[in-house]
Amino acid sequence: MDRLNQLSGQLKPNAKQSILQKNPDDVVIVAAYRTAIGKGFKGSFRSVRSEFILTEFLKEFIKKTNIDPSLIEDVAIGNVLNQAAGATEHRGACLAAGIPYTAAFIAVNRFCSSGLMAISDIANKIKTGEIECGLAGGAESMSTNYRDPRVAPRIDPHLADDAQMEKCLIPMGITNENVANQFNISRERQDEFAAKSYNKAAKAVAAGAFKSEILPIRSIIRNSDGTEKEIIVDTDEGPREGVTAESLGKLRPAFDGTTTAGNASQVSDGAAAVLLMKRSLAEAKGYPIIGKYVLCSTAGVPPEIMGVGPAYAIPEVLKRTGLTVDDIDVFEINEAFAAQCLYSAEQVNVPEEKLNINGGAIALGHPLGETGARQYATIIPLLKPGQIGLTSMCIGSGMGSASILVRE
């Protein structure tokens, strides 16, 4: 009997082998694309709102993938700054783009993970048999919403002085200062990390590395005299050449500390989406399968140091899948701030050469609700067939999320 048990154990696939297996019920990725990311307030999307960006993007997404829109049974779009997370206008954007009204819609807001939560929502619906095909993504216009006073939380006066409530209201930049102070992450290390992000992104742009993931879309620039100009947006506006730790070191801190405009993510506009299907449906319809969604995990952390979220979410998703850091070939950890990303990556022992290979949000920008989906569009081209990728981000009010996918 012991010998039989031993042989049985040898025949069972390990966690990595199991994840790489292909099954008819798998949630597969048929396509993942994004817009170029526009600079907030002065970039190519500054005159249009998120629903315009999303409509134009989805039109191009449908055209590029040649998907039959009638197959789409549900759409989940992440957004942070619109009222009600864009529930009305983003549903309208889907219809305007050619997705039929028969496709249901849900607006998702879990701060910076909203795009990933949209992917998780659609993937879980496919896993449970609710649907067989869905579209997940995110859209954000920080140019039009970032300074809107209506976005600020309004707290009941009876809770305004509650200590726990106050922690959830701490500005994100201050939480990053808390991380830097608590874990002794110097200004110099933050600037070095940020400079590497800029340099990697600049090289990627020069090499055309992002062209396969970006769908050029139409935008409109409104001039001061009221005239309008139509343009095509096809290149990220955040990356720039020649950034060094020394040049970043000359920037003044945004707060009383070490966080600057140079070592924090950029205010940005953009959209991204991932088309997910049940494997058996994708194969039956002849759609290409470029990846497989595996799992997403979210972990809570102290709100006052919310940036450490990936340091908790990544071990959680690895534990639930039985994988190790060594099993992961590429990591995309959102660079909300240099200090928090640097801390999280080091806590999990992420090899530097596997982290944000083409730069991250410090150089590219961070349209809040879009980032989680953007990471999928970015990481898939970086993976070879059979390799495993991991995406992660911190989340305002004290959380972190991480997900695992396989390239096929």
Curated annotation (Swiss-Prot):
InterPro entries: Thiolase, Thiolase-like, Thiolase-like_sf_Thiolase, Thiolase_acyl_enz_int_AS, Thiolase_AS, Thiolase_C, Thiolase_CS, Thiolase_N. It catalyses: an acyl-CoA + acetyl-CoA = a 3-oxoacyl-CoA + CoA. It holds the Pfam family Thiolase_C. Keywords: Acyltransferase, Fatty acid metabolism, Lipid metabolism, Peroxisome, Transferase, Transit peptide. It is found in: Peroxisome. GO terms for biological process: fatty acid beta-oxidation; phenylacetate catabolic process. CDD domains: thiolase. GO terms for molecular function: acetyl-CoA C-acyltransferase activity. GO terms for cellular component: peroxisome. It comes from the Eukaryota. The active site is at residues 112, 366, 394. Homodimer. NCBIfam families: AcCoA-C-Actrans. Belongs to the thiolase-like superfamily. Thiolase family. This is 3-ketoacyl-CoA thiolase A, peroxisomal. It comes from Candida tropicalis (Yeast). The lineage of its organism: Eukaryota, Fungi, Dikarya, Ascomycota, Saccharomycotina.
